[in-house]
Amino acid sequence: MILGCGNFGGIGSAPAFFGQGETLEQALDLMDAAWEKGITWFDTADAYGGGRSETFVGEWVRSRRPDGLRLTTKTFNPMAEGEDHGLAPERVRRQIDTSLERLGVDHVDLYLAHAHDPDVPAAELAGVFEELVAAGKIGAYGVSNVDGAQLRDALAAGSFSAVQNSYSLLDREVENEVLPLCAEHGLWFQVHSPLMGGWLTGKYRRDEPAPEGSRMTLRSGPYEHLRDDRTYDSLEALERRGDPTTLAFAWLLADERISVVVGPRRIEQLEPALAALAQPLSAEEREAISAEFPLVAQS
């Protein structure tokens, strides 16, 4: 399990929400709690909170000096309105240096291309990543938010070792190509958005307004397609089985091919993920839950 730090100092990479999300004090408390629970891999990105997330993680690293911490960061998105974005080699070189400075470390264990850049050939991207490996700035590299064709191009171009995509009961597109490719080539598959913006927590109810401060009141665009009776039918079926958040995590964790990036806003939100680790689903239970989401398998 990996601690997602995307809400530190913002809400993901959206410039409109930079400066929101968790404060430094709240972020430090969350990292302390995760570390105490045995979560030793933290995931961030240069654009999360416009650099605030990396800065907060760096403050934790400098003040706690943890032994055995592993770090992932990513690049692609602009760090402010009007700034550049993409995976051009000169930008990647610049961004890793500024990321390392904010994080207060001399290298990260994993560096991800945060999105596909159609203007940068996969071989060119692999080349600059290999350069960073040789320089000791990154341990390994991978891609994020890619489809099957983009992943095949990457695999043909270099030694990409990890993929991080959205995956949940409400977003199963990766089952078609990406997950099988990862299994075939031995790639580490990491899941972001395991609760689909809170939809798998039970907070969104049929014919009721979204709770104030939830993703559906702040940034509903990626989730509007879920406002559908078929979605609510599946969610209600999940709730009849038990705590939906724990079950959503357990469904993912029952697949041994993957790791889950958990991004709590409060310390107590770590508990369902930890409970899922302690109470694994059988293959039969996972299959039964999968069958309850047949009409929302594609987002």
What are these regions (language model features)?
Residues 14, 19, 81-170, 177:
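Glycine/proline-rich, positively charged
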Residues 1-69:
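N-terminal binding-site loop/beta-alpha segment at the start of enzyme catalytic domains
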Residues 137, 155-162, 181-190, 256-258:
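Glycine-enriched alpha-helix->loop->beta-strand junction motifs that scaffold or abut catalytic
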Residues 4-18, 183-239, 258:
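Glycine-rich, positively charged active-site loop/lid region within alpha/beta enzyme cores that binds
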Residues 3, 27, 42, 57, ...:
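Conserved, mostly hydrophobic/aromatic
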Residues 10-15, 78-84, 200, 269-272:
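A short acidic, helix-capping loop that chelates divalent metal ions and anchors anionic groups
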Residues 6-8, 45-47, 74-78, 113-116, ...:
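Active-site beta-loop-alpha junctions enriched in small/polar residues
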Residues 133, 194, 224-278:
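Conserved short secondary-structure transition element at the edge of the structured enzyme core
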